[in-house]
Amino acid sequence: MTAILERRESTSLWGRFCNWITSTENRLYIGWFGVLMIPTLLTATSVFIIAFIAAPPVDIDGIREPVSGSLLYGNNIISGAIIPTSAAIGLHFYPIWEAASVDEWLYNGGPYELIVLHFLLGVACYMGREWELSFRLGMRPWIAVAYSAPVAAATAVFLIYPIGQGSFSDGMPLGISGTFNFMIVFQAEHNILMHPFHMLGVAGVFGGSLFSAMHGSLVTSSLIRETTENESANEGYKFGQEEETYNIVAAHGYFGRLIFQYASFNNSRSLHFFLAAWPVVGIWFTALGISTMAFNLNGFNFNQSVVDSQGRVINTWADIINRANLGMEVMHERNAHNFPLDLAAVEVPSING
């Protein structure tokens, strides 16, 4: 009798690390994208929390007029924000070691750039991690594609727009009131409400909410009865069960009679594709709109487009919006400009001597 002994190859430390990183048995999947995602998102989150609580005022406009954004400097949850990096820094890469001191770095809004750049890297890696986990499990890749919409939107307001405008000081502040301020100034300078891509984004977000509510209510209203009146309808579903938990034929029949036959999906797969694609495409277009307006390709201008036979202007809603835009324009960054650009661009009437 001959015994054959095989020597088991010992896996290297690197090999075990690779197996652990790419294992789908972990409670939370890490993946190669996660190796970069975890430190970048932890850094962005940590600095955000510290700066939101304790960062000193920032000279956002580069005119020696610091703006307070943290809780310890007089703000609350609504008014507080991470103030964007100073206009004096512009688009320069501004890590801590580029400043003469930490005080100077804080005064010039260094934390904003640190948070934004780490955050964008982190969410991009999160998207890659979604694809990676789908790939490992043999799933289709559309979860990551759907997530690309909010990633594109965040990249547009935090990176593309500052690049187009020439300074990180024009990026969106990281706070509630700061977000509203960004929206108001964006409307004043770019007339975003009159941009078709923003309109598509509104249709995507509101339409997505409507379709989500319609789908959820239709499914909930056509559940197959599995319980008595004395227990929750949710008890009628067991995780992983093979049979349908609702009657799609009944839901299709109801909605087809409520609207008309062809307004109702009779294919569950095409229905769920539509529910995913509608808001995603809308938000893609909004991100594209922000990215084009970043380089001053602005919304439609229909100002003073209707005149009477005497040449007098008959105001339309476009003129009302324009008047609001001018008001917002003259009020923002009020000490940074000698005269607002939009008003200064108007041709001065000639005076006959």
Curated annotation (Swiss-Prot):
Sorted UniProt keywords: Acetylation, Calcium, Chlorophyll, Chloroplast, Chromophore, Electron transport, Herbicide resistance, Iron, Magnesium, Manganese, Membrane, Metal-binding, Oxidoreductase, Phosphoprotein, Photosynthesis, Photosystem II, Plastid, Thylakoid, Transmembrane, Transmembrane helix, Transport
Major localization listed first in the record, in broad terms: plastid
Known EC number: 1.10.3.9
Site (Tyrosine radical intermediate): 161
A Gene Ontology molecular function term of the record: chlorophyll binding
Compartment(s) where it occurs, according to its Swiss-Prot or TrEMBL record: Plastid, Chloroplast thylakoid membrane
Entry binding sites for a quinone: 215, 264-265
UniProt cross-references to Pfam families, sorted A to Z: Photo_RC
Binding site for pheophytin a: 126
Catalytic reactions on record: 2 a plastoquinone + 4 hnu + 2 H2O = 2 a plastoquinol + O2
UniProt modification remark: Phosphorylated on threonine residue(s); phosphorylation increases with increasing light levels. Tyr-161 forms a radical intermediate that is referred to as redox-active TyrZ, YZ or Y-Z.
Function, as annotated: Photosystem II (PSII) is a light-driven water:plastoquinone oxidoreductase that uses light energy to abstract electrons from H(2)O, generating O(2) and a proton gradient subsequently used for ATP formation. It consists of a core antenna complex that captures photons, and an electron transfer chain that converts photonic excitation into a charge separation. The D1/D2 (PsbA/PsbD) reaction center heterodimer binds P680, the primary electron donor of PSII as well as several subsequent electron acceptors.
Subunit: PSII is composed of 1 copy each of membrane proteins PsbA, PsbB, PsbC, PsbD, PsbE, PsbF, PsbH, PsbI, PsbJ, PsbK, PsbL, PsbM, PsbT, PsbX, PsbY, PsbZ, Psb30/Ycf12, at least 3 peripheral proteins of the oxygen-evolving complex and a large number of cofactors. It forms dimeric complexes.
Name of this chain's protein: Photosystem II protein D1
Annotated source species: Secale cereale
GN (gene name): psbA
